[in-house]
């Protein structure tokens, strides 16, 4: 999903353009069929689309891999995807969270190194209060929505 509608302030200023991806399931095999080539094609298309649309932020929300312990090939494919994505849209912030198919500790593995590159990965919820971010609440013409406390990126 790509959020491609411009959000405008009362002064007509653009606020943010956001890409939201989820359930990539990299490394998935379907009925013993290896989907690596198909996944590579789709990930390349996502990179091309991001380069064209230049989002401010990219959120990859869970199920990055299909297994908690992904194959080396799946990890390499995702690494190549994120590298290409960052090269195509260097100004974009990339945020990733683990899903139920991912290993939270593995997602957290290089968290501190990636922070320096404007890449945020969260596997486990933060343990310290200062690592949490504020509650997100929206109140607009469409109604009120309270998203509760979210984890820090």
Go through each PLM region and give its residues.
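N-terminal active-site segment of His-dependent metallophosphoesterases
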Residues: 2-83, 87-91
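A short linear-motif detector with a strong N-terminal bias
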Residues: 37-38, 74-76, 98-101, 143-145
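Conserved short loop/turn motifs at secondary-structure junctions
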Residues: 64-67, 96-100
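His/Asp/Glu-rich metal-coordinating catalytic cores
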Residues: 70, 101-153
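Proline-centered loop/turn at the N-terminus of a beta-strand
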Residues: 93-95, 120
């Amino acid at each position: 999903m790509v959020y491609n509608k411009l959000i405008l302030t009362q002064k007509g200023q653009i606020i943010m353009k956001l890409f939201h991806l989820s359930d990539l399931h990299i490394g998935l095999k379907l009925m013993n069929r290896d989907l690596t080539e198909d996944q590579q094609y789709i990930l390349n298309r996502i990179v091309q689309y991001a380069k064209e649309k230049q989002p401010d932020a990219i959120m990859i929300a869970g199920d990055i891999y299909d297994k908690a312990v992904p194959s080396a090939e799946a990890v390499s494919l995702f690494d190549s995807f994120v590298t290409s994505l960052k090269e195509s849209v260097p100004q974009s912030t990339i945020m990733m969270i683990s899903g139920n198919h991912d290993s939270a500790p593995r997602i957290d593995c290089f968290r501190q190194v990636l922070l320096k590159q404007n890449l945020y990965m969260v596997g486990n919820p933060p343990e310290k209060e200062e690592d949490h971010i504020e509650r997100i609440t929206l109140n607009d013409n469409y109604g009120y929505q309270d998203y509760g406390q979210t984890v820090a990126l």
